[in-house]
Swiss-Prot record:
Record lineage: Bacteria, Pseudomonadati, Pseudomonadota, Alphaproteobacteria, Hyphomicrobiales
GO molecular function: acetylornithine deacetylase activity; cobalt ion binding; succinyl-diaminopimelate desuccinylase activity; zinc ion binding
Binding site for Zn(2+) 1: 72, 105, 173
Entry keyword Flavoprotein: no
KW Zinc (keyword) present: yes
Organism for this UniProt entry: Nitrobacter winogradskyi (strain ATCC 25391 / DSM 10237 / CIP 104748 / NCIMB 11846 / Nb-255)
Assembly and interaction partners: Homodimer.
Pathway in which this enzyme or protein is active: Amino-acid biosynthesis; L-lysine biosynthesis via DAP pathway; LL-2,6-diaminopimelate from (S)-tetrahydrodipicolinate (succinylase route): step 3/3
Binding site for Zn(2+) 2: 105, 145, 362
Family of the protein in this entry: Belongs to the peptidase M20A family. DapE subfamily.
Entry note: cofactor: Binds 2 Zn(2+) or Co(2+) ions per subunit.
Record's protein name: Succinyl-diaminopimelate desuccinylase
Gene: dapE
Active-site residue numbers: 74, 144
Keywords: Amino-acid biosynthesis, Cobalt, Diaminopimelate biosynthesis, Hydrolase, Lysine biosynthesis, Metal-binding, Zinc
PANTHER family: ACETYLORNITHINE DEACETYLASE, N-ACETYL-L-CITRULLINE DEACETYLASE
């Protein structure tokens, strides 16, 4: 087992850790960190009705400043493994690329973070900081790709109960769009899902006057909701976006007018809203568009994905400088994309996301250039050098 990012990433990929299975992935990291002097804890979290999940927390040092690296070792299913040109869990290296599920999202990023920390410690007498007074920690979960209830959110609670305090965190999600160094995520839009219901009156299609068809009504409401923007965006965020994802009536009969129609939707919202104000806005628009013609209601799904922003400042400047030093490009500070575990971390310390290029994540033949693994390791090492300077 090597200490370089490629060796660590290959060992991780060879563990088929599709959520909720760990499949030995955390066991790859534990001895590497222990041998470097980290105090390592393996914690299993439980929740009724869902699978138990293994997590790992490791820390070296006891003082401040304290920087954490966060990530996950679980992966999405590989899909049709026969469609892969290399085994989905082979960790094969071909023509300068490392293949396998998780190569990009995000076993490669975890491997680079660990390799950078080990390299930094080897060069500084095994202690973080110029005088050994700082701390480096790792927050690694196996529950990010699924419902994320037994992962980072509970690992942070567990750490806080122990008295752990973090000053800053780097989350190694694949933040870059086209090339390594093009983007640092400094925030994320919130996410809220719901289902719009329109009640009609079921009846025979030959006697429409005895029924009330909810389909034209829900179609009109969908048009009304998507035709007017929720907002125009803000200085750090793009406009909020409402997307309908399904429309259903549950009616297999061609001669029956359905009694109810429903449409499911998701909203990615910016810092003009919180969940309460967003729900009120959508409900008001539905009420205004429907009038007294039909009965409507919205059932909102629980959400733990609030909008957040890590304000640009010394920490974002430090990370951007480390990125530019390695890649030669100054990264954009972005809040685009979907949700991540940063939504939990932001309640404990400022957090940014910087990792690999996400072009092939969740795809058949997911792969990462070996050169990018080497560069990302150097970026993370540069972050540590600057952080403890």
């Amino acid at each position: 087992m090597g200490n370089d990012a490629l060796s660590i990433a290959r060992d991780l990929i060879r563990c088929p850790s599709v959520t909720p299975a760990d499949a030995g992935a955390l066991g790859v990291l534990e001895p590497l960190l222990k041998n470097a002097g980290f105090d390592v804890h393996r914690i299993t979290f439980s929740e009724p009705g869902v699978a138990d999940i293994d997590n790992l927390y490791a820390r070296i040092g006891s003082g401040r400043p304290h920087i954490a690296f966060a990530g996950h070792t679980d992966v999405v299913p590989p899909g049709d493994e026969a469609a892969w040109t290399r085994g989905a869990f082979s960790g094969d290296v071909v023509d300068g690329f490392l293949y396998g599920r998780g190569a990009v999202d995000m076993k490669g990023g975890v491997a680079c973070g660990v390799a950078a920390a080990l390299d930094y410690l080897a060069a500084h007498g095994g202690r973080p900081g110029k005088d050994g007074s700082g701390s480096i920690s790792f927050l690694i979960t196996g529950d990010e790709e699924d419902i994320a209830v037994n992962g980072t959110v509970k690992l942070l609670q567990w750490a806080a109960a122990r008295g752990e305090k973090f000053d800053h965190c780097v989350l190694g999600e694949p933040s870059n769009v086209e090339e390594l160094g093009d983007c640092i995520k400094i925030g994320r839009r919130g996410s809220q899902s719901g289902t719009l219901y329109v009640d009609g009156v079921q009846g025979h299609v030959a006697y429409p006057h005895r029924a009330s068809n909810p389909i034209p009504e829900i179609a009109a409401l969908i048009t009304a909701l998507v035709s007017e923007p929720l907002d125009q965006g803000s200085s750090q965020f793009q406009p909020s976006n409402l997307e309908f994802t399904s429309v259903d009536v549950g009616n297999p009969a061609a001669n029956v007018i359905p009694g109810q129609a429903r449409a499911r939707f998701n909203i990615r919202f910016n810092d003009h809203h919180d969940q309460q104000s967003l729900r009120a806005l959508v409900e008001a628009r539905v009420a205004g568009a429907s009038g007294n013609r039909v009965r409507t209601r919205i059932v909102w799904e629980p959400s733990n994905a609030d909008v957040f922003l890590t304000e640009p400042g010394p920490f974002t400047d430090l990370v951007a400088a480390a990125v530019e030093d390695v890649t030669g490009r100054r990264p954009e500070l972005s809040t685009g994309g979907g949700t991540s575990d940063a939504r939990f971390i932001k309640d404990y310390c400022p957090v940014i996301e910087f990792g690999l290029v996400g072009r092939t994540m969740h795809q058949i033949d997911e792969r990462v250039p070996i050169a990018d693994l080497e560069k990302l390791t150097r970026v993370y090492r540069g972050v540590l050098d600057r952080y403890f300077a």
